Each structure stands twice: as C-alpha cells, then as structure tokens.
Design a protein with these regions (language model features):
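The Walker A/P-loop phosphate-binding site
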Residues: 12-109, 117
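Phosphate-binding/switch region of NTP-binding enzymes
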Residues: 52-53, 58, 63, 85, ...
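Conserved inter-motif catalytic segment of the P-loop NTP-binding fold
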Residues: 18-19, 85-176
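Activation segment
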Residues: 101, 172, 209-210, 258, ...
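Conserved ATPase "switch" residues in P-loop NTPase domains
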Residues: 73, 77, 192-193, 309
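C-terminal regions of RecA-like/P-loop NTPase motor modules
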Residues: 5-19, 157, 239-340
Length: 340
C-alpha cells in the first residue's frame, strides 16, 4: 500500500506487541508533545476523533455531513460553530447516492427546461468516493472486509486525514446486531490511532419514540457502540415543523456537554439557491420540539404499556420504551387491575 505524505505512528508497537505497557507518568510525558485537539465542528467533533452522527431516515444527515466537509475544506466555520483547522483535505465515502443525485442537491433546477444550472462550487480539497459495482471480486474476500480495505487504501493514497463514511448501513450487512458492528468500529479506531485520522461515521436510528428525548438508546444497532467511539451527536426533527431540525450532543470526550437537551442547536433545513443545507435559527430546549400527549395519544401509549407488560417487560423498561416516568406506568397498571 502506497502512502502519500502520510505514515502511521512511528512509535507504533512492533509485531507481536499488541498491548503497550508504560507507567502513567510515561504516558503523560509522551502526551505532552501532542497538541490539544482542535475543533472540526464545534464541540460536536474534534480532530482525531471517531464520531458518529445519527438520525432517522430523511432528516438531513448527509446534507449536514457535506456542509461540514465544505466548511473544513474551505477553512471556514458553519452554523456558528468553531472550525479550528486550516483548510484541509477531506474524503467523503458516499455509499448511498449516485453522482446525479448528489449533483441535484447542489445546483438550481429549471423545471420548464428540465435542466440543472448554477452548480455550487466545492473546494478541490473535497474528494468524493462512490462504489464502482464492477470493482468487487466476490471470489477474493467477503464484501465488508473488501470495502473496509478499500476505504483504508483510498484514504491513505489520497493524503486526506479526515474522512466521512455515509453510511454504516452500507458497510455492515446487519448492523442491528452489535456482534456485526463492534469489530468494524474497533478496526476504525485502530486506523484512527495508526494514521491520526478524524472519522465521521453516519448512522441511522430505528423508528423511535417521538415523545422521548433522543438518547444513546436510539442509535442503530446497540447503545454499546457508544463505548467504542469518542463522540456522538444526533439530528432530531421538530414536531412543530418537519423542516426544523435540532442538533444534540450524545457523547463527548473533550470538554463538557455544551448542547444537551436543555440547549440544542435549532436549525431550518432547506435549499438556498444551489446549496441544500442547515441554517441556524436559535438555541432551544429539546422538550419544545418533542411530541406532546393529547387524550388520543395517552390512550394509545397506555395500551402499548399494557401490551409490553404482558410481554414480560418491567415497569422501568416500559417507561424507557415509551418515554414516560416509571410512576406513570405503575399508575396505569394499577388502574387497570382495579378496573378488572
């Protein structure tokens, strides 16, 4: 494999030295020579972090990812969030869209003539990769291993130190099972450490409870993934208006939570001229954008609670599933017993 201006850590352990042991003071002395991590997308994503961005389908994950890449490759901030790096090369592994679908998001459309014009101009530092269906030889190795190796090879050969993978579903055949995704995240973490890469991985969330705040339990596959990454944030949809989204921190390693439930970044998604993007509106509370119970909703949720109880769920687990308090579940079940 050819590396262009990019080498793994020269102090990497020799073959056979899987675990490197030093005193705590030695580790600290070694770390003193390394710079404090810089922000790539405000406090959501720092340099040399493995970060996951997740949301439900059609919530603008890919649009936000491209918006972040555009800011990094041009050395500018976006959404009022600090970007502390100089303009940098980024490689975007777009494993979902075709080139035409990508083009349509970043051009104006003359509906009368049915043509695209006034295309948005990205930096030449922005590299995009998509799958060549003729490039995979099924007889050589399994698809997931082949794709992972290609991601490593193409990134090292490009010289990029920042990469975005869109998305996890296209890399892992069954990412609802932790046993399938855990090895992939471990391998990504190893690449991050070997090459000093900054990695943003896009993931879906299964259909979630719109009455409850977004949490690590909503990430596709398993909340245990959180333990394998450095940071994580989510895009939520406002129940006031589907074009309004909010960004919420789920996990941080550097610093404190700046954008938890009580202080989410509220944006409006749309296309201005030739660029589909998020536009900053305000900071707000997540509770203002969640679905709220009315009489019909409450009856539906109570019935669901009864179904879950019959399925063997504990009161605590029912409360977590439905986004209500454990006390409310206990009250509903007690009322049901009295009515019987």
């Amino acid at each position: 494999m050819t590396l262009l201006n990019q080498k793994p850590n020269s102090k990497a352990p020799k073959n056979g030295e899987f675990l490197t042991i030093k005193t705590a003071n030695q580790w600290i002395d070694e770390a003193k020579s390394k710079p404090i991590p810089k922000k790539i997308f405000g406090p959501f994503w720092y340099k040399e972090e493995l970060c996951i961005l997740f949301a439900d389908t059609n919530q603008g994950k890919s649009l936000l990812a491209v918006q972040i890449i555009d800011s990094v490759t041009k050395g500018t901030s976006t959404l009022g969030l600090e970007m502390e790096l100089p303009e940098s090369k980024v490689i975007y592994f777009d494993l979902e869209l075709t080139a035409k679908q990508f083009e349509m998001r970043y051009a104006q459309h003359d509906k009368d003539k049915d043509i695209l014009f006034d295309h948005f101009e990205f930096s030449e530092q922005f590299l995009r990769a998509e799958i060549n269906p003729y490039g995979y030889d099924v007889s050589v190795e399994d698809y997931e291993s082949f794709l992972f190796r290609e991601i490593e090879n193409q990134t090292t050969e490009s010289g990029a130190k920042i990469l975005v993978i869109d998305n996890l579903s296209c890399v892992i055949s069954d990412n609802e099972k932790a046993k399938n995704t855990t090895p992939f995240l471990i391998r990504l973490n190893n690449l991050k450490k070997m090459y000093g890469w900054s990695i943003l991985l896009i993931a879906h969330t299964p259909k979630r409870n719109l009455f409850a705040p977004i949490s690590r339990n909503d990430i596709q596959g398993s909340k245990s993934f959180i333990n394998l990454i450095d940071s994580c944030f989510a895009v939520g949809e406002s129940q006031k208006d589907p074009s309004i989204k909010y960004l919420k921190q789920i996990k941080v390693r550097y610093g404190a939570f700046q954008f938890p439930s009580e202080n989410v970044v509220v944006c409006k998604i749309g296309k201005e001229s030739n660029f589909s993007s998020f536009k900053f509106l305000e900071y707000g509370k997540e509770s203002e954008h969640l679905k709220h119970f009315d009489a019909a909703d409450k009856a539906q949720v109570k019935n669901k609670a009864f179904e879950l109880k019959e399925s063997g769920y504990s009161n605590v687990k029912i409360a977590m599933e439905l986004g209500v308090s454990e006390g409310a579940v206990r009250k509903w079940l007690k009322q049901a017993e009295i009515e019987e």
